[in-house]
């Protein structure tokens, strides 16, 4: 979905909304974090609670290890380092996952979030596979890329990302009916030329509007 369409396409249900933005980028001053901040600013303008989970700043370990496997098999409790993150995810009404595209997919840190945090017994039920703690939430995947959205769509990469992340992972397994993928595209890394900066600022304005629109939708 185009950013402008996403802003106008949002509807809402009516109480205090909790928006959690989750980022994967080692640079604190990156465009990734600027996008997350813009989204939260928009959400807070509609009186929502907006918080940031920077996976790098939190010291998150993305590597799926033996403890994770033992928990998956039902032989051990959830690893201690996941408890607070899962609590924050469970309490959120809206999850915004913000990350740059690396080799046509999410970075390793964000993949580790999927592997370890959205696990069996939390995101879906052991045995039955039924959705659990994410069911009914709103999810927005915001992907940053130097390419254009039109290229992602024409190449088939967009369809693959939507199928894998929005439809299969969040829709089928996690019970999230409202999951969408949005692009902050045509970015030029490390370039301070006025035209490029203006284009980036324009995208941030749209992201701020998106954050507000998502909250308004849930408040209707």
Which stretches of residues belong to each language-model region?
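N-terminal beta1-alpha1-beta2 submodule of the flavodoxin-like/Rossmannoid cofactor-binding fold
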Residues: 2-122, 126, 194-197, 201-220
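Short, well-ordered coil/turn elements that cap or connect secondary structure elements
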Residues: 14, 45-47, 134, 173-176
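A short small-residue
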Residues: 16-20, 144-147, 184-193
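Hydrophobic/aromatic beta-strand patches that form the interior of the parallel beta-sheet core
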Residues: 20-22, 51-53, 140-143, 180-182
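A short beta-to-alpha transition loop/helix N-cap that caps and shapes the active-site region
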Residues: 59-63, 148-150, 189-191
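A structural motif corresponding to the C-terminal end of an alpha-helix
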Residues: 91-92, 98, 137, 169-178
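Short, glycine-/small-residue-rich phosphate/pyrophosphate-handling segment
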Residues: 125-173
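Glycine-rich phosphate/pyrophosphate-binding loop and the adjoining helix
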Residues: 156-220
